Amino acid sequence: GYLGGYAAPAYAGYAAPAYAGYAAPAYAAPVAAVAHAAPAVAVAHAPVPSSAANTYRISQTARLAYAAPAVAHAPLAYAAPAVAHAPLGYAAPAYGVARYAAAAPALGYGYGAYGYAAPALGYGHALVH
């Protein structure tokens, strides 16, 4: 992976199509992704009451999360805490990644079924060669 703080396009920049419907842009800086992770986490853990006030708050949080391409491009990010917690280095069972690869640090995932290695912000934890 690049050590300059950007995801390598061939590895961490794009999600495997079979598991994620949307690809994360390769140009997203990891620092920006982590900084914008809070809205996605907030949406994933937000209560779902019927009050108009909370509905508005959740919709506003979702709007902010969608502004962070590296975190919020996948619709499942709002339903699955494991996806919203990607900056913490968890695998995303909602995408089926956990069946093929262990969790990679930070934003990188290893898609074992495809033979990709996840640089994960330059740490270079190659899961499959």
UniProtKB/Swiss-Prot annotation:
This molecule's function is given as:
Component of the cuticle of migratory locust which contains more than 100 different structural proteins.
A Gene Ontology molecular-function term?
A: structural constituent of cuticle
Q: Where does each sequence repeat begin and end?
A: 7-10, 15-18, 23-26, 28-31, 37-40, 67-70, 79-82, 91-94, 103-106, 117-120
Output this protein's name.
Answer: Cuticle protein 12.5
- What's in the keyword line of the UniProt record? Cuticle, Repeat
Notes concerning its domains? The tetrapeptide (A-A-P-[AV]) repeats found throughout the protein are also present in many proteins constituting the protective envelope of other species.
Superkingdom classification of source = Eukaryota
